[in-house]
């Protein structure tokens, strides 16, 4: 049920990413992992494997199911990136967040039902935002 953008598909198999020092060093699983590996390899650029940014969805009106309800060529799948409680994991360029990595390959991977901790403080548990009240925007 996780989503890989720009592929605009719901994953139906487990894909395991090995990450060391901020870079993907291995992609394991079945067909979907092979598809992801080949897509990233095509760019022939080690920077495509770099982690660019992370975040989590806060929009209660965004729907995880929205991508399946529209033509694949319509829109940018913003619901997939924003639905409440997702963990958004991204690879590739990071210049928009102050980094220096430039590469044409960018993946956004919204993950469902994750547990996210920052400095040992729970932020998302099983897809529910539990960040401390003082850290939430008003």
Regions found by a protein language model. Name each.
Residues 1-138:
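Metal/cofactor-centered catalytic core regions of large enzymes
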């Amino acid at each position: 049920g996780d989503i890989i953008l720009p592929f605009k598909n719901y994953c139906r198999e487990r894909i395991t990413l090995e990450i060391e020092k901020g870079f993907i060093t291995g992609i394991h699983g079945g067909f979907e992992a092979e598809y992801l590996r080949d897509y990233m390899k095509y760019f022939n650029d080690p920077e495509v494997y770099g982690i660019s940014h992370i975040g989590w969805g806060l929009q209660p009106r965004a729907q995880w199911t929205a991508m399946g309800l529209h033509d694949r060529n319509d829109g940018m799948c913003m619901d997939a990136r924003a639905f409440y409680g997702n963990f958004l994991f991204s690879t590739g360029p990071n210049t928009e967040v102050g980094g220096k990595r430039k590469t044409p390959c960018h993946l956004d991977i919204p993950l469902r039902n994750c547990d996210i901790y920052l400095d040992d403080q729970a932020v998302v548990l099983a897809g529910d935002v539990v960040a401390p009240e003082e850290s939430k925007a008003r």
